Amino acid sequence: MKTETTIQGLAASLNPARAARKIIGFVPTMGNLHEGHLTLVREAKKLCDVVVVSIFVNPTQFGPGEDFDNYPRTLEQDSRLLADVGCDIIFAPSVEQMYGTQPRLTNISVSQITDDLCGSSRPGHFDGVALVVTKLFNIVQPNYAFFGQKDYQQLAVIRQFVQDLNIPLEVIGVPIVRAEDGLALSSRNGYLTPEQRQVAPVIYQGLKQAEEQLHQGKDLQQVLADLKTLLTDNGFVVDYVEARQPNLLAASQFDRDIVLFVAAKLGGTRLIDNLQVAFTPQ
């Protein structure tokens, strides 16, 4: 396994694979890796000859007062984990390598599907994601890119700009990886105190309860209200509890498939989760 820190170095490492027409897979991360990230790498290994994992804490997707400065940088530990699952190349650039030293005048913005959910509470976040992922796609030039479905809205944004900008790759969404108690794996779970970690699985428990209620024919808006109450009663500060169609348009009682979304803070830690529900009205 190689580690490259410059765009030129990565290109040199990938040139032999390109010349041999090998299939290149790409997993973008911000490091502080967990089993969810490693699952993405394993999925990439199934489809691709060469797998590149980027580790870059991207400043443009953090808003004021968010955790950019405190976000864990664990490159040595991440490298060991990636070697164990067969990663071929780590790309770990500096901020200067990715953005240069001159003023940045170009932005990439995806409208409509970023207007609510995490987009309303984290203004500018998805613009930062779209910019850095586009830059990484241009640098790596993969055949496939792999993203977790925990960040469902982010995945939708990436699919949208890949389609709109004719970026020649396929985006693969990988199902959420959960702890045994149902909590969706996230690098930010490490911010939770032991007591908060015991409470955090209530999000998934509530989503599963909501799914069951929908299958029983309960009113969608009442189900969402009950889920919000459950979270509030357990100490969460709820950002949103929403239902959407898979394309992120507003969902109704009569849609056959919906996605339930939750974002809530537990102490100072913001947690997100979602559950896709195949729903047949009673």
From Swiss-Prot:
BP term (GO), one: pantothenate biosynthetic process
Main function: Catalyzes the condensation of pantoate with beta-alanine in an ATP-dependent reaction via a pantoyl-adenylate intermediate.
Binding-site positions, (R)-pantoate: Q61, Q154
Similarity remark: Belongs to the pantothenate synthetase family.
Catalysed reaction equations from the record: (R)-pantoate + beta-alanine + ATP = (R)-pantothenate + AMP + diphosphate + H(+)
Assigned EC number: 6.3.2.1
Protein name as it appears in the record: Pantothenate synthetase
Compartments (UniProt record): Cytoplasm
Enzyme class label: ligase
The keyword Nucleotide-binding is assigned to this record: yes
Miscellaneous note of the record: The reaction proceeds by a bi uni uni bi ping pong mechanism.
Keyword Nucleotide-binding found: yes
Residues the record marks as active site: H37 (proton donor)
Gene3D superfamilies cross-referenced by the UniProt entry: HUPs, Pantoate-beta-alanine ligase, C-terminal domain
Pathway: Cofactor biosynthesis; (R)-pantothenate biosynthesis; (R)-pantothenate from (R)-pantoate and beta-alanine: step 1/1
Protein residues bound to beta-alanine: Q61
Primary location class: cytoplasm
Binding partners and assembly: Homodimer.
GO terms under cellular component: cytosol
Coiled coil start-end: none
Residues at which ATP binds: 30-37, 148-151, 177, 185-188
Lineage, broadest ranks: Bacteria, Pseudomonadati, Pseudomonadota, Gammaproteobacteria, Moraxellales
Molecular functions (GO terms): ATP binding; pantoate-beta-alanine ligase activity
Pfam entry (one): Pantoate_ligase
